[in-house]
Each structure stands twice: as C-alpha cells, then as structure tokens.
Amino acid sequence: MSWKFLFKYPSPSRILEQADEDMTTSVLLIVALVLTICAVAFQIIGVAPPYWVSIDTASLKMHYGLWTTCTEVQTVTTCEDSDADEDWQKAVRAMSILGLLVLSVAVFMTVLKLFVMKDKKPVLFAGIGTSFAGGIFILIAVAVFAAKQNDELANVDFTYHFAFAFSIIAMITAFAAGGVMLFSMTKE
C-alpha cells in the first residue's frame, strides 16, 4: 500500500487556514456591500430633495436643490421646478445621477462577487471600479455646485443644507466601500 495519496491532499491545518482566509474575505465583502448600499441610499437622499442651499433673510426664506426651488414669503411657500439653464447646472445634475447609477452597479457587482461568482476576480475589479467611479462623479457634482454657489452668492448669506451634506457622505461612503473591496482583493 502506497502512502503517497496522503500528500495529494492539503493538511487539516492548511484547510483551516484557507477557510479562515475565505471567511475574512467574505466579511470584508459584506462590509463593502453594506457601505455601497448606504452610499446609494445617501445619494438618493442627496439628489431628490430641494435642500442643497438655504437662504434666510428677514423678508424671504428660500431653499433649492438640483430640481426644485422653494420660496417662502410671509408664510406662503411656493415651489417650482428649476430650469437648468446653465451648463454647470446640467453638469451637476448629470454627475449626480451618474454617481447614483454607477453606485447601483457597484451594489450589483458586490452581490455577484459575494453570492454568485465567488472566485471571479473581474467581478471584484468591476465592483472596485464602479464604487470609485461613483464617488468621483459625486465629487465632481459637489465641487462644481459649491464653486458656482460661492461665486454667484458671494454677497448673500447662505448655508449648505442637508441634501448637499448627504451627497458628500455618499461620496465618502463610496470611496470607503471601494477601499474595503480593494483590501479584500489583497486578502484573496
């Protein structure tokens, strides 16, 4: 009887080591999935409401976002759709929506890697790329919007409101998710 068949199979300690590495990778990918889902939710909250900027004077209260402008004069509030007349407004809208869509793809890629194509690295690369791309799109939108508001409202006392902050949080969360996925790739 030959004992060579014992050397074909990994030792029990190697099997446990491999299981531990797989567990670490799975936990990291679950963390990345949660972060990516949070980034999508934060970006939805950031894009939808008319609360990117708030202006509050003695006679007028006004707040607006990417799509709607609301004005309150003597307790009468009116809201109307904002026309994106200038190119920078169209660019901010486009970058915000692209960021949301690309982050949705990142969620899909992370789910694919975690549950369906566990040993396919290209799916992980796509998840990493889309997560970082979504963050970059949102960064461009936020930076352009803030620069233009600071220029156009230089003589007006205004504050950035919660939806603007949620877009920034979505961007940071997207970068964090991409970083966690990148780190999990080094563990594989």
Model-derived features: where do they sit?
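Coil-to-alpha-helix initiation sites in intrinsically disordered, low-complexity, charged segments
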Residues: S2-F5, D22, G65
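A surface-exposed beta-alpha-beta supersecondary segment
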Residues: L16, I45-R93
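Interfacial non-cytosolic loop connecting adjacent transmembrane helices
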Residues: T75-E80, A84-D87, A146-F164
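Juxtamembrane helix-loop transition sites at the ends of transmembrane segments
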Residues: L60, K120, N155-V156
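Signature of small four-pass
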Residues: I15-V53, Q89-K148, F164-E188
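Non-transmembrane, juxtamembrane loop and terminal tail segments
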Residues: S2-L16
